[in-house]
């Protein structure tokens, strides 16, 4: 459900610099980024507000991206609507994409993110 300003994107990222970069990229693409700093806050935000897509860092304090993804998959099995989740990580070794997709992620973008890769993955996971 895109807003009049594009997509509403939850950015789950603990690094302040990466938060600013992600929000700036989203803004440049005409989207709105809402930032949380860990997986627990991402799960809470997803319970309270509608989002079109989630950019989820893998390594975060309190509740990492993989634990949050597992909880989202459980919610999905219970019939809760979960937006597509794109894992954003510095883990960019052979097999990493398959690992994250196999765990239930809808997409994957390696850090450092660039606008072209983010745009392509947003389009792919949203079927555009």
Model region roles, listed by residue range:
Residues 38-41, 64-71:
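Acidic catalytic/metal-coordinating carboxylates
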């Amino acid at each position: 459900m895109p807003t009049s300003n594009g997509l509403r994107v939850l950015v789950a990222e603990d690094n302040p610099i990466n938060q600013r970069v992600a929000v700036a990229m989203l803004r440049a693409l005409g989207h709105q980024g809402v930032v949380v700093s860990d997986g627990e806050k991402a799960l809470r935000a997803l319970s309270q507000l509608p989002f079109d897509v989630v950019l989820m860092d893998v390594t975060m304090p309190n509740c990492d991206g993989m634990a949050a993804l597992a909880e989202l998959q459980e919610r999905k099995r219970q019939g809760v609507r979960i937006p597509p989740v794109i894992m954003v990580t510095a883990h960019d070794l052979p097999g990493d994409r398959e690992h994250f997709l196999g765990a239930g992620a809808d997409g994957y973008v390696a850090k450092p993110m660039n606008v072209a890769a983010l745009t392509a993955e947003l389009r792919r996971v949203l079927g555009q």
